[in-house]
A protein has these predicted regions:
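Boundary/junction segments of secreted and surface-exposed precursor proteins
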Residues: 1-19
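N-terminal and secondary-structure boundary signal
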Residues: 13, 17-33, 66-68
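Extracellular and analogous surface-interaction loops
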Residues: 23, 28-31, 36-47, 83-90, ...
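A short beta-strand element within beta-rich, extracytoplasmic domains
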Residues: 46-55
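Extended, low-complexity, turn-rich repeat/linker tracts enriched in Gly/Pro/Ser/Thr and Asp/Glu
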Residues: 55-60, 101-105
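Short, surface-exposed beta-strand/strand-loop-strand elements in extracellular ectodomains
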Residues: 58-79
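Secretome/extracellular-domain signature
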Residues: 75-120
Length: 120
């Protein structure tokens, strides 16, 4: 699962994810509700889920900023967690993929969290 090629606080639309997942095993299998991706487990099995948090915003990427190169830094990497889960066919997962924030010249923000939860 991905950001479907978009950023921002509202997340992707159905059309954006349809386009992003075209030609993959997710084609037609992801439904968007308020920017959250819903995926129905196709078969009862043990699934490995690896979730990546978004990286933080880059600082000082404006080449005209007078404090570069002293304070120009790339944002830190997001956390990564992984686990194996036995999931039953028909169970719906809600997936919210964290987004990289805007880059600014000073006091940029952290990246968005990534969440994978059961729908019930």
């Amino acid at each position: 699962f991905t950001t479907c090629g978009v950023s921002g606080r509202t997340g992707p639309t159905q059309n954006q994810c349809n386009s992003s997942y075209s030609g993959t095993n997710l084609t037609g299998n992801v439904t968007l509700v308020d920017g959250i991706q819903h995926w129905t487990i196709p078969a009862t099995a043990t699934y490995t889920i690896k979730a990546y948090g978004a990286s933080g915003g880059d600082n000082g990427k404006d080449p005209n900023w007078s404090s570069c190169p002293y304070f120009c830094r790339d944002g830190g990497h997001g956390a990564i967690i992984q686990g194996d889960f036995t999931l039953v066919s028909g169970t719906v997962l809600k997936i919210l993929v964290g987004h990289h924030p805007e880059n600014v010249n000073w006091l940029n923000g952290g990246g968005g969290g990534t969440f994978v939860v059961l729908s019930n």
